């Protein structure tokens, strides 16, 4: 086991003397002034406090106010009466005041149904539950357009109609029964 060096303890007598009288614990100093109506209690630490029992210095001022003469005009209720009246009106035993009637909507405006949150259904294999699945999906061209939809036959399903997309065509419509129209819309593969 290696030898441990003992550090020499610093003597606590080498510190400079404190300007106030030192004693064990705390000094309680009372300042009482006849001119002022405040009683000041000051706690201050004396000496160098150790880390174990360090008490922060506390400064406490407790003001003392002289009694004030009643300066209210005759006929006005006192603060005690007002506070008692307020306490009785706000007590829990008294019934709550009836709520005011809400503003009635005018008869000219139609009454709206209350807003309900949307309901979410689990995803199903069919796109819509109300519409029956059809083999041929039809596409109605917008007004002013004379292009015809291109129909093509796939071996898995019947004839389908391609909806035009605004993107560049990936491939031209290929069909075994109809020639591909040149100005027609493109079909995604």
UniProtKB/Swiss-Prot annotation:
The GO terms this record gives for MF are: RNA binding
GO biological processes: mRNA transport
Q: Where is this motif: Nuclear localization signal, and RNA-binding (RxRE)?
A: 2-18
Record's subunit section: Homomultimer. Multimeric assembly is essential for activity and involves XPO1. Binds to human XPO1 and KPNB1. Interacts (via N-terminal nuclear localization signal) with human NPM1.
What keywords are assigned to this protein? Host cytoplasm, Host nucleus, Host-virus interaction, mRNA transport, Phosphoprotein, RNA-binding, Transport
Q: Which family does it belong to?
A: Belongs to the deltaretrovirus Rex protein family.
User: Describe its PTM?
Assistant: Phosphorylated.
Q: Does this UniProt record's set of keywords contain ATP-binding?
A: no
Q: What else is known?
A: HTLV-1 lineages are divided in four clades, A (Cosmopolitan), B (Central African group), C (Melanesian group) and D (New Central African group).
Give me the stretches of Pro residues compositional bias.
111-125, 178-189
Q: What does this protein do?
A: Rex escorts unspliced gag-pro-pol and singly spliced env mRNAs out of the nucleus of infected cells. These mRNAs carry a recognition sequence called Rex responsive element (RxRE or XRE) located at the 3' region of the long terminal repeat (LTR). This function is essential since most HTLV proteins are translated from unspliced or partially spliced pre-mRNAs that cannot exit the nucleus by the pathway used by fully processed cellular mRNAs. Rex itself is translated from a fully spliced mRNA that probably readily exits the nucleus.
Region Disordered: start and end of each range?
Answer: 1-28, 84-189
Q: Which residues carry this modification: Phosphoserine?
A: 70, 177
Protein name according to UniProt: Protein Rex
Q: What induces it?
A: Down-regulated by P30II.
Q: Return the annotated region ranges for Homomultimerization.
A: 56-70, 123-131
Q: Which GO terms describe its cellular component?
A: host cell cytoplasm; host cell nucleolus
- Motif Nuclear export signal, per the record, lies over 82-93
Comp. bias regions, Low complexity: 84-94
- Comment block on domains: The RNA-binding motif binds to the RxRE, a complex secondary structure consisting of four stem loops and a long stretch of stem structure, present in incompletely spliced viral pre-mRNAs. This region also contains the NLS which mediates nuclear localization. These overlapping functions prevent Rex bound to RxRE from undesirable return to the nucleus. When Rex binds the RxRE, the NLS becomes masked while the NES remains accessible. The leucine-rich NES mediates binding to human XPO1.
Specify whether Ribonucleoprotein is a keyword of the entry: no
Ranges of Polar residues compositional bias?
Answer: 127-164
Q: Which residues carry this modification: Phosphothreonine?
A: 174
Q: Where is the composition biased (Basic residues)?
A: 1-16
Q: Which domain of life is it from?
A: Viruses
């Amino acid at each position: 086991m290696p030898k441990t060096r003992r550090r020499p303890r610093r003597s606590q007598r080498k510190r400079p003397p404190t300007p106030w009288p030192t004693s064990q614990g705390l000094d309680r100093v009372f300042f009482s002034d006849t001119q002022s109506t405040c009683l000041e209690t000051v706690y201050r630490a004396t000496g160098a406090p150790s880390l174990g029992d360090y008490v922060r210095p506390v400064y406490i001022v407790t003001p003392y106010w002289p009694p004030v003469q009643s300066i209210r005009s005759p006929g006005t209720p006192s603060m005690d009466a007002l506070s008692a009246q307020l306490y009785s009106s706000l007590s829990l035993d008294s019934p709550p005041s009836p709520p005011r009637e809400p503003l009635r909507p005018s008869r000219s405006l139609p009454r709206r149904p209350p807003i309900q949150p949307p309901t979410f259904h689990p995803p199903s294999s069919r796109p819509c539950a109300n519409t029956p699945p059809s083999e041929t999906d039809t596409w109605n061209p917008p007004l002013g357009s004379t292009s015809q939809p291109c129909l093509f036959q796939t071996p898995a399903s019947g004839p389908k109609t391609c909806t035009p997309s605004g993107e560049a065509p990936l491939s031209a419509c290929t069909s075994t029964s109809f020639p591909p129209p040149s100005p027609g819309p493109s079909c995604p593969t």
